[in-house]
Amino acid sequence: MPTTLETAVAKYLRSGNPAQRTREEYSTTLRKWARWGNTIPIENLGRKDIRAFLDWVYEDAAGRDGGNPGRTANKVRSHLRAVMAWAWEQDMVGALPRFPKVKPHRVVAGRHYLTKPELNALYFASHQMTRPRGWSEPFSVGRYWRSALVVFFNYGLDTGTVWRTETFHEPIRCRHVSWDRQSPDREVKEQSPWGWLFYRRLKTHKAFYRPMNRTVHAHIKNIMPDDPDPEAPIFLGGGTRPNKRFRTLCGLAGIGPKTNIETGEKQPWVLRDLRKTCATYYDEHVPESSVEILGHSAGGVTYRHYAHRAPLAFRAIMTLPQPSAFAALSKGFDGQCPCCRRRFADG
């Protein structure tokens, strides 16, 4: 028996027990669907139908108040995609339809990601980081932070995966790095010429074997001791409060606090924002790739489907355009500006 969108939404909401505000938003989407007047069952819902509905939502919103029709259409798109992804997981539909791109819209919320010029500024400002009291490590603290910025950008890691600040954190250790082309996970068919990195998400404890691209490879090599202890953490210099040092780094880079548009409140950037930055640039590069790379469960898609997304994640990681500053090391310009060759003095 064909499944209507109304039935699918009701089952989807019952499965997740969302907040009342979320339920109301989905009800609004269903009212728009009813006013559109097309009763296509979800089994037959395709990209062409979805585009037609979203175009109607956009035009309807523009005709009613004209405030921000793109945002309205994109909100409806996110609801449809979440329901269809859940229906796919439940085997209610044979395949997840491709969705049209999001529509241009006026940003009404604060920006929660860092731009590439800001990442460049952070990277170069790390040369100004002062030596912490009692620092006796072989490399400057700035060198560790430059490598950390690179892995935050490329993998969207949790802070506790880079620097262990709590007893339950599992940081990346020297034994978690493999320089082989073949992944330590033998189920992974792809081969990486730059090696592999293992880590585990704090929230879900899910293990990941990720390929290193050229930029990550160069920065991991740059902080790896000649005779590494397999149990030693790779990244040092976070201290007991990495976010405090990150705020200092933002100050050195001349990056002001972000602004909450609703309240006007100034809020400092935190390391979690680098995770949001990672998701932003991955989805810009390869749409939907951040779901797998960050280890999210989006729209009810569970990990049993992620095996099919592994090639997508591999391609996204290996081809992600990097901030220009990140290329300085791999091009042989470590410690100097790649454009003017001005040398930086590490603290």
Where are these regions (language model features)?
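Active-site/catalytic core of tyrosine-dependent DNA strand-transfer enzymes
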Residues: 211-266, 283-286
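Short, aromatic/basic-rich helix-turn unit that serves as a nucleic-acid recognition element
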Residues: 2-30, 68
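Short, polar N-cap/turn motifs at the start of nucleic acid-interacting alpha helices
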Residues: 168-179, 265-268, 285-307, 334
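Conserved tyrosine-mediated DNA breakage-rejoining catalytic core shared by Y-recombinases
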Residues: 101, 155, 164-222
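N-terminal DNA-binding recognition helix of tyrosine site-specific recombinases/integrases
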Residues: 32, 40, 45, 64-101, ...
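C-terminal catalytic core of tyrosine-transesterase DNA break-rejoin enzymes
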Residues: 150, 154, 160-161, 273-297
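C-terminal secondary-structure termini that scaffold catalytic or DNA-interacting sites
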Residues: 1, 174, 180-187, 226-229, ...
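Basic, Lys/Arg- and aromatic-enriched nucleic-acid-binding interface segment
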Residues: 74, 93, 99-159, 163
